[in-house]
Amino acid sequence: MAYNGRDQEYGGHALQDLPAGSSQYHLPPQENDEEQGRGLLNSGYEQDRLGARTPPDRPVSAYSLTESYAPGASSAMPGQGPTGYGDTGGSFGQFGNLDANAPFPRPDSAFDPEDSWVERQQQPQMGGGGGLGRSKTRKIKLVQGSVLSIDYPVPSAIKNAVQPQYRDAESGTEEFHKMRYTAATCDPNDFTLKNGYDLRPRMYNRHTELLIAITYYNEDKVLLARTLHHTMQNIRDIVNLKKSTFWNKGGPAWQKIVVCLVFDGIDKADKNTLDVLATVGVYQDGVIKKDVDGKETVAHIFEYTSQLSVTPNQQLIRPTNEGSQNLPPVQMIFCLKQKNTKKINSHRWLFNAFGRILNPEVCILLDAGTKPSPRSLLALWEGFYNDKDLGGACGEIHAMLGKGGKKLFNPLVAVQNFEYKISNILDKPLESSFGYVSVLPGAFSAYRFRAIMGRPLEQYFHGDHTLSKMLGKKGIDGMNIFKKNMFLAEDRILCFELVAKAGQKWHLSYIKAAKGETDVPEGAAEFISQRRRWLNGSFAATLYSLMHFGRMYKSGHNIIRMFFLHIQLIYTTLNTMFAWFSLGSYWLTTSVIMDLVGKPNATSGVHAWPFGDTGTPIVNALLQYLYLAFVMLQFILALGNRPKGSKFTYIASFMVFGLIQGYILVLSAYLVVRAFDTPIGDQISFASTDAFLNSFFGGSSAGGVILVALITIYGLNFIASFMYLDPWHMFHSFPYYLVLMSTYINILMVYAFNNWHDVSWGTKGSDKAEALPSAHVTKGEKNEVVVEEVEKEQEDIDSQFEQTVRRALAPFKEEEEVEKADVEDGYKSFRTGLVVCWLFGNILLIVCITSTNFDNLGWGEPATERKAHYFQFLLYATAVLSLVRFFGFLWFLGRTGIMCCFSRN
């Protein structure tokens, strides 16, 4: 259907047709996917699919997608051998029944998981003989003489897995029969129709309403499958809509949705994930070309429409009947970048290359590993459909807690879970009410494509270092350190530029119904490294938005929106100021609470608690010194050590600060109890308004202040969580947060600010890409530019696919990463230990000599006498050392004079 992305309507359906805050979509009741119990692969395909012309001496593959290699799969055949991947003794489906008389026995070694990925990319040699060597060659004409774009037949098992109603409806296309590969030898900005590049959805004249992007760095196949499979399930939710004012008009719903996977470099990619994508049909080994006629390939682009999916537990999902639980066809684009050029560059391929050709209305961004909940992507899209001025939105991201919440036993996971929950309950709704959500997380967010086109994307892509030469001083290499840190939180820049876009009134929103799960760091080193980027980036981006707030006046926002944006400006400014002084504030809070509880007052009859009038001041003093010592230790560590190189020191720091904070919480509880020993009526006067205010905020008792603290710090969190109908984090995660909240400042912020200079940019080459085959150009019969390559037989494709599926569906074994400290880490660790010993030794000396807290114990002399005696010791010691030096001088002088008399010429 014809579609103009710049119009204010969806092909004639006004964006405001549906009332805001409600949905008129009627979703069918959805059953839970029983991945392990479903008959996943129980429908075979034609036995004579190889055709009558198959050579009689050619061994025919016994493989079909009716097999399952996962433990407990229902399609396992009886009487199979014990050599399967499964834990229950299952085998490789039909291969388990091959006997000695089978025409094509395959030993286990044929499926060596260590088989080199690079070797599989090499083209088979042309020539005679059996096997792959007898394959024919074909000549591929380059588009406009420079663009290599080839259609490759997909394995028979993939092709035959497509349901007949879809295969027959698209019989005039090669969508389900062939995978399309394009070697992009250009910058993303030059990936245009004018330069000969194109994508299948546009070639088939389809309107793309929803472009779902999954960005990938080096995640394993379980994380990728988790995101891709649940994305396909979300697409099924949309396709199964019964009553819709949009999706059921103008063609099938699945043709309006495109899933785009962008991999950030060949070297960093886990090659097992490529096997998963090959099983789905959107990738094949032996296809990619490292260059075309000597021009380096920048990105390898694969396209295919598939109904297959692989679950996170390595189950293969394919259509089994005509039921609504079958996955619909999903149009996929897989962009494998040759080099690791960072996430911003991946988004440039998404928006500037693919987005400009497909012209989608809404782009949803996901990170590999994020698990969108059912109907979440639909909820995000509905937000845009119901609000024509919505430029961007995000859903609720919560931490993945493991089966039965077992990860909550890890304090770091619990703390992050509470942080995510409170952000979703209090922070995001507040900012959404203002119309400007300061950050839409790149792991789970959505943008209206025409809203971010222009200046928002231009400013956003200034952080792409591949553009640094072209942009000059405006590029990443020409930026000062402040701007470089700003691009560590590049999503915040895009949000601000979108809301401040000149002449427009786009706003941002938080959509509660859209939910996504993501993994969080479970170790101290990973947690610190992640927060270093987040804290520095968010601080710089926040200052950028505050300093450039004046650009809001050039936008098209109405006076009411501008009023609330000014309120948000004041709110953000105050928060930034508190964050700046938080290090000192935490120390002052700690010391004040210790003094309030730990110092006896003879006049009022108040005694020190909990160790008595004698012991409490000493314990408090030691804890205060320990607190300061570990704060100084954080500065020493942060100025030179990697978190992974000082893992145990950081763990000890978390424990020490947690111990001190726990002690402070106990003292605070004691203060509350002591404050309310006196009846509240005696502390706060209700005689008049002035009397109430004076006694509540300025009275000698602490009752009013403590009430305010209890309500704002604890009460509001509980009330909001219960009103949100999600209070459980207040019970299992909030206690951890109370104990470890000081570490957010004393460890995370100290490390972040001390590593403000650490901005990791730069491209990494691809060693594996160097070994890939090239596309050599020749002249054809009509003098056109062509590339000659081997054309594989269908039997060869199917045979290789067997091994691919075996690798993809093999149970995942997580390899424990052994962090090997390099030589420099060893040097830095020694340096740190040396400085710590030197610094703490001097601090200990000062404490022992000058502290008056030891006087009450009767240990030795009072502090004043200790100082005097230490001063005397210094004088005598200095005198003795000086005399020793002088006597040494005399000895040297006399010896030299005597030896001079007896020396020989």
Swiss-Prot record:
An example Gene Ontology molecular-function term: chitin synthase activity
GO (cellular component) term, any one: cell septum
Ranges in a coiled coil: none
Record-listed E.C. numbers: 2.4.1.16
Protein name in UniProt: Chitin synthase 3B
Subcellular location: Cell membrane
Keyword set, alphabetical order: Cell membrane, Cell wall biogenesis/degradation, Glycoprotein, Glycosyltransferase, Membrane, Transferase, Transmembrane, Transmembrane helix, Virulence
Residue positions the entry lists as glycosylated: 536, 601
Function recorded in the entry: Polymerizes chitin, a structural polymer of the cell wall and septum, by transferring the sugar moiety of UDP-GlcNAc to the non-reducing end of the growing chitin polymer. Plays essential functions in fungal survival and host infection.
Reaction(s) the record says it catalyses: [(1->4)-N-acetyl-beta-D-glucosaminyl](n) + UDP-N-acetyl-alpha-D-glucosamine = [(1->4)-N-acetyl-beta-D-glucosaminyl](n+1) + UDP + H(+)
Topology with respect to the bilayer: Multi-pass membrane protein
Top EC class, one word: transferase
Single GO BP term: chitin biosynthetic process
Extent of Gly residues compositional bias: 81-93
Induction note: Exhibits lower expression levels in hyphae than in germinating conidia. Exhibits the highest expression levels during colonization of wheat.
Consequences of knocking out this gene: Leads to lethality.
Residue spans of biased composition, Basic and acidic residues class: 1-10
Domain of life of the organism encoding this protein: Eukaryota
TM helices/strands, residue ranges: 562-584, 618-638, 653-673, 705-725, 733-753, 832-852, 873-893
Keyword Signal assigned: no
Stretch list, region Disordered: 1-136
InterPro entries hit by this protein: Chitin_synth (IPR004835), Chitin_synth_fun (IPR004834), Chitin_synth_N (IPR013616), Nucleotide-diphossugar_trans (IPR029044)
